[in-house]
Curated annotation (Swiss-Prot):
SUPFAM superfamilies: 4-helical cytokines. The keyword Secreted applies. GO terms for molecular function: cytokine activity; erythropoietin receptor binding; hormone activity. Keywords: Disulfide bond, Erythrocyte maturation, Hormone, Secreted, Signal. GO terms for biological process: erythrocyte maturation; nucleate erythrocyte development. This is Erythropoietin. Belongs to the EPO/TPO family. Disulfide bonds join C32-C180, C54-C58. It is found in: Secreted. It holds the Pfam family EPO_TPO. It comes from the Eukaryota. Erythropoietin is the principal hormone involved in the regulation of erythrocyte differentiation and the maintenance of a physiological level of circulating erythrocyte mass. Residues 1-22 form the signal peptide.
Length: 185
């Protein structure tokens, strides 16, 4: 038994030494692990599916402003990191405002947990951005001044925008974040 335990500790030690050996890529910071974002995307899709199957008490009370989700890669790559971060943060803020309105509009209680989850996930993404030293976003006094937005009037459209925004611009920002780049030690 002692030999088994000793071998296990030796294997663990060798794995740690191999992992931290100079000259190899350093492991990603946990905050940069895209599996977290993938989980948020899955939950956003679940909310969208639940909304599509809803027949009663699941509509928006008014149309809402949401971010554009289409990414022109030539334009995106010409933007500096601060501009990209501001675009993502303004989109997250718009989605949070829209989801808060949806939460108060929807009377179907089965959807409340999906909407609450989506709002919590947006707050978590904002916390991730802060931990990556991305400057805090200051929302505008009015959404009229925001570029790259449009309006949706259905809850399903809102949740589809939510999914696509996470899959697109949020993912791109996290992939390109300086703190998430793997450096050779």
């Amino acid at each position: 038994m002692l030999q088994k335990r000793g071998r296990g500790l030796l294997v663990l030690l060798l794995m740690l030494l191999e992992w931290t050996r100079p000259g190899l890529l350093s492991p990603l910071r946990p905050i940069c692990d895209l599996r977290v974002l993938n989980h948020f995307i899955k939950e956003a899709r679940d909310a969208e599916v639940a909304m599509k199957s809803c027949t009663e008490g699941c509509s928006l009370s008014e149309s809402v402003t949401v971010p554009q989700t289409r990414v022109d890669f030539d334009v995106w790559e010409k933007k500096n990191g601060l501009e990209q971060a501001q675009e993502v943060q303004s989109g997250l803020w718009l989605l949070q405002q829209a989801l808060n309105l949806l939460r108060t509009s929807v009377t179907n209680t089965a959807l409340h947990s999906h909407i609450d989850n989506s709002i919590r996930n947006l707050l978590s993404i904002n916390a991730v951005l802060r931990s990556l030293n991305i400057q805090e976003y200051t929302p505008p006094a009015s959404t009229v001044a925001l570029e790259g937005t449009w309006r949706v009037s259905s809850a399903t459209d809102l949740l589809q925008v939510h999914v696509n925004f996470l899959r697109g611009k949020v993912r791109l920002l996290l992939l390109d974040a300086q703190a998430c780049q793997q450096d050779v030690s």
